[in-house]
């Protein structure tokens, strides 16, 4: 069991399995997640340069992004020293550099220790989106459990499942500027949905 719980993302099998389940769920159920935040007011807000766009994607951050890239290429992720913020004051401790989504343009972002679903309008109850999000992630975890329960070599099969899932659903991962026109074109090439209004 000690191999399952480690500090680095790529060493933490349980974390990577849950991460893969969330990525798969967001990719496969983009439409349900978008519907969960639909309203006339929110349709105008999304993509209005003060909120995420209507195209759903997952922001992973630099550290996790490099881990995903390594897994996708079939190589072992290497530990990378955390960058520290230099304050120029000797009496203050070093602070680790933030690798999260600083410009907050991503609708679904991993921010170091949690996911944030940022498409909800201020008047929304979180109940509906949470119900959908929990249900779709549970669906993916059930599929993973079915695949792993009879595993002969659990850790190898878990790693293979994570790698396969990331390769099949990496189109939903985007770490750039979600407001850019280039992203809208790239998202269309990737086959991602751009449901700008509730009618769609």
Task: List the model feature ranges, each with a label.
Residues 25-200:
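Acidic, glycine-enriched catalytic cores built around paired aspartates
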Residues 1-5:
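Short, small-residue-biased leader/transition segments that mark boundaries at the very start
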């Amino acid at each position: 069991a000690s191999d399952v719980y480690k500090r680095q993302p790529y060493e933490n099998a349980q974390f990577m399995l849950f991460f893969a389940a969330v990525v798969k769920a967001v990719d496969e159920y983009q439409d349900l997640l978008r519907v969960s935040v639909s309203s006339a007011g929110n349709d105008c807000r999304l993509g209005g340069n003060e909120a995420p766009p209507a195209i759903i994607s997952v922001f992973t951050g630099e550290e996790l992004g490099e881990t995903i890239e390594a897994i996708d290429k079939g190589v072992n992720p290497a530990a990378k020293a955390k960058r520290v913020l230099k304050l120029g004051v000797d009496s203050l401790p070093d602070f680790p550099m933030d690798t999260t989504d600083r410009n907050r343009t991503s609708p679904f972002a991993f921010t170091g220790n949690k996911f944030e679903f940022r498409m909800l309008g201020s008047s929304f109850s979180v109940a509906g989106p949470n119900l959908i999000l929990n249900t779709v992630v549970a669906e993916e975890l059930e599929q993973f459990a079915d695949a792993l329960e009879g595993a002969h070599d659990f850790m190898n099969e878990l790693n293979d499942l994570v790698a396969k899932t990331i390769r099949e659903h990496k189109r939903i991962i985007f770490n750039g500027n979600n407001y850019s026109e280039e992203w809208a074109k790239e998202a269309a090439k990737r086959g991602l949905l751009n449901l700008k209004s509730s009618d769609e």
